Regions:
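Terminal-region recognition feature
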Residues: 1-133
């Protein structure tokens, strides 16, 4: 049990490093909110529940392997004006926000969850296109 918890803490730390101050500054210098800031702005305070935050991704781009958690998209659900809504917010700082296999699977998962509950889906797009893997 302790090992599992230590792995979880290591993932939390890696995710926090992935979205550090340099990342925020880069987005703000472009006149953009970060993917997480867009989610926080959209949903009623404290209601957003992220889905698959720790989905691992390892893609090769220009001969370099890029490892990240979440694969450049934040997915989940929460309330907007008290109504349940599902959403995804693409992160341009991870592979240009491009759509890869893990990224697409996360979006499809929240779309399926929304369909089952009769809830709307909001997509916050900040993407350079698709990764053809």
């Amino acid at each position: 049990m302790r090992k599992s918890f230590e792995k979880f803490l290591a993932r939390q730390e890696a995710l926090a490093r992935q979205y550090g101050e340099a990342y925020e500054e880069k987005q703000h210098n472009r006149g953009k909110l970060t993917a997480r800031e867009r989610i926080e702005f959209l949903f009623d305070e404290g209601t957003f529940e992220e889905v698959d935050a720790y989905s691992p991704s390892a893609t090769t781009s220009f001969g370099k392997t890029v490892r990240s958690y979440g694969d450049g998209v934040i997915t989940g659900f929460g309330n907007i004006n008290g109504r349940q809504v599902f959403a995804y917010s693409q992160d341009f700082n991870v592979q240009g926000g491009s759509l890869g296999s893990v990224h697409a699977a996360k979006i499809i998962k929240v779309q399926d969850m929304a369909l089952k509950t009769g809830s709307p889906v909001v997509g916050l797009i900040d993407s350079g296109g698709a990764r053809i893997q």
